[in-house]
Amino acid sequence: VNKFTYGIRLPVINTKIIAINSPQRGDVMVFRYPEDPSLDYIKRVVGVPGDTVSYQNKRLTINGLPVETTKVFDYHHPERLYYSEQYVARMGDVEYKYLNDSDAPAFIPDATRFPFRENCTYNAAGVICKVPDRHYFVMGDNRDNSRDSRFWGFVPERNIVGKAFFIWLNLSSPSRIGSFK
């Protein structure tokens, strides 16, 4: 994790003293989990402050524009005996793969109360959220098996740890160990 990509913070009090960059759509970001800041989470940034993020019927749109996606070969989960639909998506200069399970519902039944919850509308097809100032909307690349902003809300800027750029250890996909992002 590059802790300086988004700025330099004072230790202990976590105050940003030098702003360098802001998280961009498509970045893989490490942050302190909003519901328990003692835990670090890693997710992909899909919405930045001011964006309207819509995830309806498993289709992601940002500010009314669908995220460019292409279906590729299905992904086999070696530890479970099933396949997920796999897609390649592009956000700006970032291209990445994500998974969808065609049998999983788009509806999010157990979204909790969270700050700025009023910025989100939940319906049978999914969720639409307006990202507040100094907050980010993040999603996991394994969409139907990810607890992310759809469930627990936005990531405050103050919770950002840094930008992920190197895969240190991935036991489920050893070929990715040591690769750069």
Placement of each model-derived feature along the sequence:
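Soluble "head" domains of membrane/secretory-pathway proteins
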Residues: V1-K181
